[in-house]
Amino acid sequence: MDWDHNVTFSAVRSLQATTAVAQATDNVVDLDRNRVDSRPGVLPTKNESSPHSSASLPPPSPHPPPPPAFTPSPSPSPSPSPQTATARSSVTDAAPAPKRSPRSPLHSNGSFPPVSDPISSIDSRDALDIDHESTAMLASSSSARKSKPKLQPQLINHLPLAQQAAMATFHEITFNDYHDKKLGRPPGKFDDYMICDCTPNSGNLDMACTDYSGCINRMTQIECSASKCRWGKQCRNQRFHRRQYVDVDIVQTEKKGFGLRACQDIPKETFIYEYVGEVMNQTTFLQRMQQYRIEGIRHFYFMMLQPNEYLDATKKGGKGRFINHSCNPNCAVSKWQVGKHLRMGIFAKRNIQKGEELTFNYNVDRYGNDAQECFCGEPNCVGTLGGKTQTDLSGMDDLFLDALGISDEVEQTEAKGSRRKRGKRLDLDFIPQMRAIQEHEATRVMTAARQAGPKREILEKLLRRMEMTTDVNVQKSLVKLHGFILMQFLLEQWWNDRDIVILIINVLARWPLIARNKVIDCGVEDQVRILAQTYRPRSPEDQKPSLDALRQVKQDDSAADRNDYTQVQPTLAPVRIGAPPAPDAEVSARAEHLLEAWKKLDMTYRIARKDALKPDADDHKDATAVTTWIDRRRMQDLDDPLDLEHAQAPNAVSSELGNALSGDQELREIKPSWQPPPAPPSMPNAPAKRMGGAVHHRSPPGSFTPTRLQSSGQSPLTPDQVTSVLSSSLVKSLSGLVSSLKQQGIQLQQQQQQQPPAQQQPSAQPAAPSAKSIEDIIREANEQEERARKEAEAAAKAARELEVNGGQTSGSSRKRPSSASRHSDKRAKHSSLSSSSQAASKLISSNGSAADSTSKAGSVESVAANERRLRKLVGELVVRQMSKYKDDLERESFKRHAKELTNAIVGKEMRNPKSWPPARGALTELSLDKRAKIKAFAKEYIDKLLARKGKGKGSSTPSNNEGAGSSNNGIV
C-alpha cells in the first residue's frame, strides 16, 4: 500500500500511541515494579505495595538509571511513559543511536525529539510501526510472560548506616554457643578421614584447595583441616576457621528493619559471613519459639542445623543475622563440615554489585512463627515468607533442584509460583521423573545428600538416583566424594526407616572397593551389621543383645577401652530417636549378603598400585605396610592413592553375589605366605581332576604313587609325602609351623581311614598294600617329624638372635610369641605321635573305628579354620586400636608390635578351655564382650609400650621384659 510519507503526525499523536503500548505492556508483564515506583509520574497499581519502593533505588532524578542494554539520552524526558515501557521491556537488543529507526518505543533511547520539528523526527511509517508493535505486544502476551528477563539488582546506596543501633540489639559472639558439647556434631567418623587429595606440586596458589583444583572437600562443603591439609597455610579452603568475611554495612531499611549492604563487588561462590548463634536441641527450640511469640519478636532468626538441632541468633549472634529475605536472593546459606562441627555460612549465589542488599530465601532455611507478608519487592515474589513445607518448590533450595535434575523443568513450568499463583508441591502436583546420575552431577548430588537433613522426600529421591546409576565412572566419583562416610551418617540418622535403609544398602552393594579397610574405617560396616540384627526376626527373649549392640557401636572410643562397657552411655543418643522398626526378613537378608560380600575382600594396609595388582607380582603381601588412612592420603609418590581401576563391587545383594566374589577369593588364596600341604583325599581323585590328572611331583621316589591306587578309587597321601611337604613349607615360613603340624595329624588320621579298604581289595594288586609295613610307616613318619622339628627350632633360634642383635626395643618382647609357638609345637608333636601310634592299632580294628576317625579329622580341620578366622578377627581389632596412636609409633615399630599383640591375644584365647574351641563349631564373629576385652587388653599393652618409649632408649630393654611379663595376664 502506497502511503503518503508527507503526511505529518503531531507529536501528541505519537505520544498517545506510545502511551497505549506502555499501558498494554503493563497489563501483560509485571516486571521490576520497584524502578517503576521510584520514577515520577507513575502511580503504582493496587498490587504494587513494594517495601523497596524507595529503598531499592536512589532518589528519583531527571536521569533515572536505565537498563544496561542501552545508553540514556542526556536530554530530560518530558514524559515518563516511554521510560516506563523501556524499563519493563523484555527485549535487550536495543541500539543507543538516536538516528536508528527503532522497532518500537520499547527499544528507543529513552528521549523524544523536540515537538517543534516533528517532520524530521517521525513520519507516517514510524507511526505505523508503532501501531504494528502495539498490536504485536497485545497478541503475544503469553510469550512475554514466559520470557524470563534478567532482573536488575536492587541498589540501596541511599539507605543510611545503622551500625551502632543494630549492634545494640543483640550480644555479638564470634563462634557458636553450644548448649551441650554433643550438639553440632553430625553422627559419623568425620575426624581423621576428611582429607582431600590435593597435591601441592606447583607454585600456583590457585590450585591450593580452590574451586579450580577439584578439591573433594570443597566440592562436598567440607573445610580442610588446618593441621592435616597438604597445602598447609596456603590452603584456601579454611575460610570458616580464618574468618575470611566480606566487608558489609548494616543499614536501616524502610519496612524490613536492619539489612546488610555490600561494600564491594562480590564474585560468585564467595564466602560472605558465618551465621553464628546459640545451638540448641528441639525442646529448647520450641520453648524459645513460644517465648519470642509472647515477647512480640516477629523477625526470623532460627536456622535448622541438623535434625533436632537448631541455631538461634535472636539474642546472641553476629552480623549475618541482619541479612534479609528475598524471593530472588543473591546469597544462599550452606552447611559446612568444619572440624567436628557443622557450621552455617552465607555464600554469594551470583556476582553481587557494590551497593546491593544481601538477601537469601528464608523459606529454604529459616524457621519462625507464623507466615508473614513478604516485602522483598521482587517481580517473582511469592507473597509470604515462612509457613512453607519441605515439598513446596517455592521454598526449595536450588541445590536440591539441581541435584534432583529438575531445575529446567521447574523453570519451564513455573512450578515455584508467584504472588498471584500458588507454587507446586513435590510429589503432589509436581511429580518429577528420576534418572541416573551423570558424571558432572555427582558433586551436586553428594552435597545435596549431606544437606538434606530432615528432608526425607528429597533424600529418598537422591538415593533413588544413586541406586539407578550403573555407570562405573559415576560410582567411582561418588565413592571418592566421601561416599562411604556419607552412607554411615545416613544409616545412623535413618536407621528405623525401612525404605531409606533398603535404598542405602542397594547403593552400597553397587559401589566398588579395593579392600575392606574403607568400610571398616568409616564405620559403615558396623552400621550394616547393626541393621542386620535390628531387622532380623527374633523371639522376645532375644531383644536384649540387639539393644546391647546398638549401645556398643554408639559408645565413645575411649569408653570402649574399659572392660565394663555396659555402663557407658551412648555419646550420640539423640540420633536414635523414634521407635525401633518392625522386623523385616528382607532387610536383614540384604544386609547379611552385603556383609558377606565385603568379608570376601582383603584387609590390606598398602596403597593399591597398578604394578602391585598385576598377576605376576609374587609375594606382594609380604611387602605390605601398616598405614593409616591419612598415611595413604599423604603418600607423595602416588598421583591417585584411591585408584579404583581394580576395585571389586558387590553388584547385587543376592545369592549370585557370593558366587561372583568366591572366584576372586580363591585367586587371592593361591599365593599365601606359606604353602600348606595338599588337601586330604576325602573325595577320591579330587586332586587329579583339579590338576588334570597330573601326578604331584613333590613325592619322594620311595613313597606311594597315586596312580598305583587309582584302581581302588583312592589316592591317599603317605607320611613321606606329608612330611616332605611340611619340611618344604617350614623352610619358607616359620609362621606355618603349628598349622602344618596340625595338617600332618589330619593326614595321618586320614591314612588310617583310607588304608583298611585298600587291604580288603582283591589280590589283583597285592603289592600296593604290602609295599611298606605299618612299623616302617610309623618309623619314617617319626624321623621326618624329628627333622622338621629340629629345622623349625633352628630357624626360630636364628630369628631370635637376629632380633636381639637388631635392636633393644623389641628383643625381649618378641620372645613371648616364639615361646608360645614352641609350646604349641610340643603339643602338636605329642598329638601327632599319639595319632601315629594309634594308627597302627586302628588299622587292624573293625571298620567302625574308621567312622570315629573321620569325625575327629573333621574336627581338627575345623579347629584349624577357626584359628585362621580368630587370627584375622583379632588382627583387625588390634590394627584399629593401635591406629589411634599412629603418631607415636614409627611404621616398622607399628607393624612389629601389631603382630606381637595379635599373636599374644590369639595364644591366650586358644589356651582358654572355656572359650576354645568354639562351642558352636565354626567361628564367625567375636562377641561384643570379647571385642571389648580385646580392646582393653590392647590399650593396656599400648600404654605400657608408650610409657617405656617415654623413658628413653637406654631403659627400653628392661622395660620390654617387664611389659612382656605383665602382658601375659589373660584377657578372658
From Swiss-Prot:
Residues 770-806 form a coiled coil. Its EC number is 2.1.1.359. It comes from the Eukaryota. The keyword Chloroplast does not apply. Residues 57-81, 674-684 have a biased composition (Pro residues). InterPro entries: AWS_dom, Post-SET_dom, Set2_fungi, SET2_Histone-Lys_MeTrsfase, SET_dom, SET_dom_sf, SETD2/Set2_SET, SRI. The keyword Secreted does not apply. Pfam families: AWS (PF17907), SET (PF00856), SRI (PF08236). SUPFAM superfamilies: SET domain. It catalyses: L-lysyl(36)-[histone H3] + 3 S-adenosyl-L-methionine = N(6),N(6),N(6)-trimethyl-L-lysyl(36)-[histone H3] + 3 S-adenosyl-L-homocysteine + 3 H(+). Residues 246-363 form the SET domain. Residues 370-386 form the Post-SET domain. Residues 191-244 form the AWS domain. Residues 83-92, 702-721, 847-857 have a biased composition (Polar residues). Residues 784-803 have a biased composition (Basic and acidic residues). GO terms for molecular function: histone H3K36 methyltransferase activity; histone H3K36 trimethyltransferase activity. Residues 111-122, 831-846, 959-972 have a biased composition (Low complexity). PROSITE patterns: AWS, POST_SET, SAM_MT43_SET2_1, SET. Gene3D superfamilies: SET domain (2.170.270.10), Set2, Rpb1 interacting domain (1.10.1740.100). One of its GO terms (cellular component) is nucleus. Keywords: Chromosome, Coiled coil, Methyltransferase, Nucleus, Repressor, S-adenosyl-L-methionine, Transcription, Transcription regulation, Transferase. PANTHER family: SET DOMAIN PROTEINS. Histone methyltransferase that trimethylates histone H3 'Lys-36' forming H3K36me3. Involved in transcription elongation as well as in transcription repression. Belongs to the class V-like SAM-binding methyltransferase superfamily. Histone-lysine methyltransferase family. SET2 subfamily. The AWS and SET domains are necessary for transcription repression. This is Histone-lysine N-methyltransferase, H3 lysine-36 specific.
